[in-house]
Structure formats: C-alpha cells, structure tokens
Amino acid sequence: MKKVYFKTFGCRTNLFDTQVMGENLKDFSATLEEQEADIIIINSCTVTNGTDSAVRSYARKMARLDKEVLFTGCGVKTQGKELFEKGLLKGVFGHDNKEKINALLQEKKRFFIDDNLENKHLDTTMVSEFVGKTRAFIKIQEGCDFDCNYCIIPSVRGRARSFEERKILEQVGLLCSKGVQEVVLTGTNVGSYGKDRGSNIARLIKKLSQITGLKRIRIGSLEPNQINDEFLELLEEDFLEKHLHIALQHSHDFMLERMNRRNRTKSDRELLEIIASKNFAIGTDFIVGHPGESESVFEKAFKNLESLPLTHIHPFIYSKRKDTPSSLMRDSVSLEDSKKRLNAIKDLIFHKNKAFRQLQLKLNTPLKALVEAQKDGEFKALDQFFNPIKIKSDKPLRASFLEIKEYEIKERENHAVF
C-alpha cells in the first residue's frame, strides 16, 4: 500500500480540510514522515506572496526528490496551473474534490481539476479523529461575502455558505466521544455562520455547549460587526474560552476606508471595551504597509492601538495580490518602513499581554489549562486566555484539564508546578 504525506500550509480551515482528505483515504495509508512517503499532497495557501513562494519552493523540492506530487487548496487558482505546466505536479484539484482523493490518487494520467465556485460545494465527510486528540478544529462554514480591497480569499474560496447545524453537532459529538475536549470553530469567515440558514453563531455555540465531554469552545476569528447582543450574552458562560479574536485589520478610519472594511475605530473601541470588561483577552489582525498608510496615519493608528484593550495580535505586512483593488493603488509603503511598524506593534502588544497576565495573578484568577504536549520534562498547555503555560509535574498530565492557582509570570508565558 502506497504511503501519502500531507503538507498543509496556511490556516486552521486548511488543517480541517487535510483531515477530510485523510478520512477518505481507502487504498492508501497516511504517514507523518515525509521521507517515507510515495505521494505528497500539498494543501496550499495563497493569502500572501510569501505563502505562495513557500508553496512553490516546497513543490520544487518534492519534485527534485522524485516524489509524486498532488496539489490542492487555495493556491490552485493562483499558481496551480503554472506549477502543473512546469511538470512539477502529477495532479491538481480544487476544494470541491477533496473527498474524491482516493480516486484521484489512482489516476494514471496527469490531471488538472479546478473548482466552479458557483456550485457552493460543502463537504459531507465526518472526521473520526483529529491530530492532537484533545483539541480539534471544526469547520462550520466556507467562503466569504466581504469584499476587502486587499484580499484574494473570496475569489478562491467562494461566497459564504454554512454547514448544516445537525452535521456540525454530530461531528463534534463524534470527536468528543474519542477524547476531544476543546473545539475551535473555524472557516473562511466564521462569524457569518448561519446567515444563509436563518441562524447565527451564538445559537450554534449554545447547542454545542450541551455536548457531553466538550469542556471549552474557542472561536477562530470574528468580524466586529458580527458580534450582536445575543453573542455578548455568551461572555458570561464558562464553556466559552476567555479569549476572542476580533479582526480589526487597522486602527485608523482612513485606512479602514481604503481597505473597504466594514468596521470603524469608534465602534471597534466600544465593542472591545465591553468585551474587556468581562475579563476577556482580546486578539486581532493588523495589516501594516497597505497603500496610503503614511507616517502620520500610522502614528495616529499606533496611538489608537495603545489605548485599546488588546492582549494578542497577528500583524503582517501588506502583500500585493493580483487583481485586487488594493493592488492598483499607487501610494505604496516601503518594505523598510513596513518592517519597523510591524515590530513596533509586536512590541506594544507583547507588553500589553504581559500586563494582562500580571493583572490575572494580582486578581488571583486561576488558570484553566488544557495540557497538550510534553517536551524536555515540561508539559505545554494553553489557558482560558489563550496564553501558553509550561507545567512541571511528575504526574501523567497529558490531555488533562487543570485548574492552576499558583503560577509565575515569565516574559512570554506563565510557569507552574503541579
């Protein structure tokens, strides 16, 4: 039986998609060791030029090693054809064909199968286990109806559509029966869940919370305008992780308008302050170096960031994507300036995060941590605020949910003895 190795680039949605493909392998076996694989399946990402480059490099490397390489994911529409025509790939297939992986692997001839995004395809595969066992990523929707000027993803994932609630509940129930204790709800635009089905993400979360064995629910990312009063009521519930990732993308209205974003700084501040008042950690995304971000604009944006109750951030440098409105804008920002701004933001939120952790210690807040791994004599876990904690213990703590009352604050994580 030939062995298949999955190389996954990009987001949590791609991780779930890889699990879907793995579940559909019938005449092949999956391996975690790249070198022993006969076939490499690249599940690609195309969110930035950097990810495109990393994907290309990996495809070339595998081709040089004389591996049989299949290519799928968001990169199919941006560089799949180019890599295929160069002879680096045995086959290319779009998102709609993941569940046909077993048949595709048996194809004798080279093939190129793209998606028709008008089909609004949704997978039906039930994932029976998840790598990592205790935490699982659950895709609840696909696609995005937002039209942000810088973003290429709607053109490769299609418009927003939601999985059936019954299927999601069944999927989570199955995984929890096999030891999963925490789920991370993911998708292209998670907060849009239910819009096409007369429901919403708050109602889904309430039903998920009733599943036996599920101890914590985490949400991948939300848009500010998707958080309504019904969702805010959930902040009082113990089953929801005390951390929300809210995609602001910038903290200056001029840039938000430039990006064709739906949020604005005043309402963003009001929302974040409400959430922070519930003792929640708050993360966000932030794009630096988008066309139009002058020095004065960034300085004002940075001051706004300083005053926001943020604890985590995923900042990245604007990446020019072909055929997006932003790619046609001329007032670009130098890479040197972009890097300086990126580092300034990272440093700011690093100190905010440490201050938040110190506050929790002062308030005698116990950390509720899910232990995921053991390395170098220490256990690694994530607490309810999405902060890492290292735990020294002689006990078999793997896959345990702990309440830690005594801990130390270190530079980048908390430490404890249990």
Swiss-Prot record:
It comes from the Bacteria. [4Fe-4S] cluster 2 binds at C144, C148, C151. Residues 130-355 form the Radical SAM core domain. The lineage of its organism: Bacteria, Pseudomonadati, Campylobacterota, Epsilonproteobacteria, Campylobacterales. SUPFAM superfamilies: Radical SAM enzymes. It comes from Helicobacter pylori (strain J99 / ATCC 700824) (Campylobacter pylori J99). Coiled coil: none annotated. Disulfide bonds: none annotated. Its cofactor is [4Fe-4S] cluster. Its EC number is 2.-.-.-. Keywords: 4Fe-4S, Iron, Iron-sulfur, Metal-binding, S-adenosyl-L-methionine, Transferase. Belongs to the methylthiotransferase family. It is an enzyme of class 2 (transferase). SMART domains: Elp3 (SM00729). This is Putative methylthiotransferase jhp_0270. [4Fe-4S] cluster 1 binds at C11, C45, C74. Residues 2-110 form the MTTase N-terminal domain. GO terms for molecular function: 4 iron, 4 sulfur cluster binding; metal ion binding; N6-threonylcarbomyladenosine methylthiotransferase activity. Binds 2 [4Fe-4S] clusters. One cluster is coordinated with 3 cysteines and an exchangeable S-adenosyl-L-methionine.
